[in-house]
UniProtKB/Swiss-Prot annotation:
Originating species: Desulfitobacterium hafniense (strain Y51)
Protein's cellular compartments: Cytoplasm
Superkingdom assignment: Bacteria
Protein name: Trigger factor 2
Family: Belongs to the FKBP-type PPIase family. Tig subfamily.
C-alpha cells in the first residue's frame, strides 16, 4: 500500500492510496463463494456455477462492488494511519478503473479536525442587557395557558355544538374547480375569535355524524390575491363534539395545578419562574455575544460536510420535538410566517457557529490544560442524570460511555468561564444617545 497526501484545505484532506491487487482478488473470491448460491445458469446446478461462467453471463464486474465494500474500510484505515490524519466524519471515496493484475488506485477526501488559531482571549467587551421586568399581565398569561391545558373535556354524544365547544371534523374543499387534499381530524374551536378555515361559525348546532355542505366567500383582501373573493365549497363530516370547561382561578386550582395552598402563593411561584427564565435569556444573550466576538478573534474553518451533519441533526431534533407536540415543521413555519429556505439557512448558520464554538473551546482546553476532578465528574454525572430524568444515584456507573461527554462538557464550561472572567461586561442602562 502506498498513500500520498495531496493537500489539506478548509479542514478537508485529499489523498490517494493504492490497494494490492491480491487483496482485491481474495475479496472477489470470497464474494463469489458467498453469493454463488444465488446464481442459476443452464447446464449447471444452482449454487455450482463456476465464477468464470457467472462473470461471462452477468459481466466481469458483477462482484466488484461487494468485494470493494469488503476491503475498503480496512484499506482506508491503513492509509489514514500512514498519513497520520486526524479525521472526523465519513470519507468520499472514488476507485479508479480496475485492471486485472494491477494495483487499485483510490482517491479519498475526508474532513479532518479543524486547525484553530486562537486570538486574544481576554478583554472581550459585551453589553449586558437588563432582564425584562415581570408584570402582572405576564403572570395572567401563564395562568390562562394553564387553565386551557388543564381544561375539562366532556364528549357531547348527541347534544348540538355551541359556542365554546370544540368540534372535530373531516372535510374536503373545492375552490374554483380545484379539489384539495382531504383534511382529517381538524379541530374547530367555536369561538368568536377563531375562524381559521372560514366555516367554524357555521358548525353551531351541528351534531356528531352530521354531514354539512358549507360555502364560504373568501374575503377580497385575502393574502393570496388569486383566490380573493372566490367561493370555497366545504363538505364537512362531524366526528365529535366536545364541551370545554375552563376551571376557575381559585385556591383549588392552585392546589391542583401548582401544588401550593393558595392562588397568591401560585402567582408568586410563577413570577419567580418567569424572573429566572428572563435572567437565563439575558445570560444566553451575553454568552452569544462573547462567542460572536470570539469568532472574530480566532481562526477556524469548519468543513461543509460537518456543518451539513450538524444542521441535519438539529433539524431532525427540532422536527421530532414538534411532532411530539402534535405539530409539523411545515405548520410551524406557517405560524411564524417564515420560508423554508430562510429557516434552513438559519439552521446552517447555527450549526456552523456551534461547531466553531466546540473547536475553539477544545483548543482553549488544551492551551490551558483544564482537567476535571473525581468530585467534579461525579457531581456532573448526577446533574446530567437528573436532566434526562434518571436517578442520580450511582449516575456515573449508569451513564457508561456518556461519562466522557460529561467530562468534556465540564472542561468546556471551564474554558468558557475563563472567557467570562476576563471579559469586560457593561450593563445596558437603557440610555439612548443621538
Amino acid at each position: 500500500m502506498n498513500a500520498v497526501l495531496e493537500n489539506i484545505e478548509n479542514s478537508e484532506a485529499r489523498f490517494r492510496f493504492t490497494i494490492d491487487y491480491k487483496v482485491f482478488a481474495d475479496a472477489l473470491e470470497k464474494t463469489y463463494r458467498k453469493n454463488k448460491k444465488n446464481y442459476q445458469v443452464a447446464g449447471f446446478r444452482k449454487g455450482n456455477v463456476p465464477r468464470s461462467v457467472i462473470e461471462s453471463q452477468y459481466g466481469p464486474t458483477v462482484f466488484y462492488q461487494e468485494a470493494l465494500d469488503l476491503i475498503m474500510t480496512e484499506e482506508y484505515k491503513k492509509a489514514v494511519e500512514s498519513l497520520a490524519l486526524n479525521t472526523i466524519g465519513d470519507p468520499d471515496i472514488e476507485v479508479g478503473e480496475i485492471e486485472k493484475g494491477q494495483e487499485l488506485s483510490v482517491k479519498a477526501s475526508v474532513p479532518v479536525v479543524p486547525e484553530v488559531t486562537l486570538g486574544q482571549l481576554e478583554g472581550i467587551e459585551v453589553v449586558m442587557p437588563k432582564a425584562r421586568e415581570v408584570k402582572e399581565r405576564d403572570i395572567d398569561k401563564v395562568l390562562e395557558e394553564l387553565q386551557y391545558k388543564n381544561k375539562k373535556i366532556t364528549d357531547k354524544e348527541i347534544a348540538p355544538a355551541e359556542k365554546g365547544d370544540t368540534v372535530t371534523v373531516d372535510y374536503d374543499c373545492e375552490l374554483d374547480g380545484t379539489k384539495f387534499e382531504p383534511v382529517v381530524d381538524y379541530k374547530a374551536l367555536l369561538d368568536d375569535s377563531s375562524d381559521t378555515m372560514g366555516f367554524e361559525g357555521q358548525l353551531e348546532g351541528a351534531q356528531k355524524g352530521d354531514i354539512l355542505d358549507i360555502k364560504k366567500v373568501l374575503p377580497h383582501d385575502h393574502p393570496q390575491p388569486q383566490i380573493a373573493g372566490k367561493t370555497a365549497c366545504f363538505k364537512v363530516t362531524v366526528k365529535k363534539v366536545e364541551r370545554i370547561e375552563i376551571l376557575p382561578l381559585d385556591d383549588a386550582f392552585a392546589q391542583k395545578v401548582g401544588n401550593v395552598s393558595t392562588m397568591e402563593e401560585f402567582r408568586a411561584e410563577i413570577k419567580k419562574n418567569l424572573e429566572q427564565a428572563a435572567a437565563q435569556r439575558v445570560q444566553m444573550q451575553r454568552n452569544n455575544a462573547i462567542l460572536s466576538e470570539l469568532f472574530k478573534r480566532c481562526q477556524v474553518k469548519i468543513p461543509e460536510s460537518l456543518i451539513m451533519q450538524r444542521a441535519m441533526s438539529m433539524l431532525e431534533q427540532f422536527s421530532g420535538q414538534l411532532e411530539a407536540e402534535g405539530g409539523t415543521l411545515d405548520l410551524y413555519l406557517q405560524l411564524i410566517n417564515k420560508k423554508s429556505g430562510d429557516f434552513k439557512r438559519e439552521v446552517w448558520e447555527d450549526a456552523e457557529n456551534s461547531l466553531k464554538a466546540d473547536y475553539i473551546l477544545d483548543k482553549i482546553i488544551k492551551e490551558k490544560g483544564y482537567t476535571v476532578s473525581e468530585e467534579e465528574l461525579n457531581q456532573g454525572c448526577e446533574k446530567f442524570a437528573l436532566s434526562i430524568n434518571m436517578s442520580p444515584e450511582n449516575a456515573r456507573q449508569k451513564l457508561g460511555p456518556l461519562v466522557h461527554k460529561v467530562e468534556h462538557d465540564l472542561k468546556a464550561e471551564k474554558a468558557f468561564q475563563y472567557l467570562l472572567e476576563h471579559a469586560v461586561i457593561r450593563e445596558d442602562n437603557g440610555d439612548k444617545t443621538a
